[in-house]
Design a protein with these regions (language model features):
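Sequence/fold signature of self-assembling virion shell proteins
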Residues: 1-7, 22, 104-201
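Intrinsically disordered or highly flexible coil/loop and linker segments, enriched in small
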Residues: 44-48, 85-88, 185-186
Length: 201
């Protein structure tokens, strides 16, 4: 496996736009914001794309608050039939699916944390599979949820390097540079450990 995603960024911060107390934190705060708002979302979107691309089972249908729980159980059952252990599995769900499953009376009655959901309004787990809410923009088009096992995908970040240069030549302030070398791979013999549900276009 050879990583193909070699990404970099650079930006400057003018020292004159910050007062004395802000200056010491300005470059570090800007770098953290860049990582949080740009780098991490890009890597996550790429990973979800690769996971969906490599899935053995992709189902298209419609999710409503009346069938969200049953739709999810169908996916979990598919993994069980593919000899995928539920231990180590997780589900990434869109905000729409999250809303539908929270309103599905079957889930509220039968979910693993049904009492906590009734009391606290929290989404919990289904058959030991944790539900992780993901912004729809992170998923490929029309994907509602993904159930996968951690053994199915490897996603190395081979190089993650960030530097802040204080007053480099020609700049009165900071030059911030970063480079990330990463990829994501679905293992050929683990494709059956991924279940993707999409809505009809």
């Amino acid at each position: 496996m050879t990583s193909t995603r070699d990404r970099s960024f650079t930006f400057t911060i003018d020292r004159g736009t910050y007062n004395d107390t802000q200056r010491s934190n300005a470059a570090g705060a800007a770098l953290q914001r860049q990582i949080r708002e740009v780098v991490v979302p890009e890597i996550d979107k790429y990973r979800f794309g690769k996971i969906c691309e490599g899935a053995k089972t992709t189902v298209t249908g419609k999710v409503t608050k009346a069938n969200a729980y049953d739709t999810f159980l169908t996916g979990a059952t598919t993994l069980i039939e593919n000899n995928v252990p539920l231990v180590g599995s997780c589900a990434f769900v869109s905000s729409d699916f999250y809303k539908n499953i929270k309103e599905d009376s079957s889930f509220i009655r039968n979910g693993d944390m049904s009492q906590e959901i009734l009391i606290k309004g929290q989404v919990g787990t289904i058959d030991g599979i944790p539900l992780i809410i993901v912004p729809k923009s992170y998923f490929p088009e029309n994907v509602e949820f993904i159930i996968t096992n951690q053994a199915a995908t490897t996603s190395p970040v081979k190089l993650s390097e960030y530097k802040i240069h204080d007053n480099p030549p020609g700049i009165n302030g900071w030059l911030v540079e970063g480079r990330v070398y990463y990829d994501a791979f679905v293992l050929e013999n683990k494709k059956s450990a991924i279940y993707v549900f999409k809505t009809a276009e």
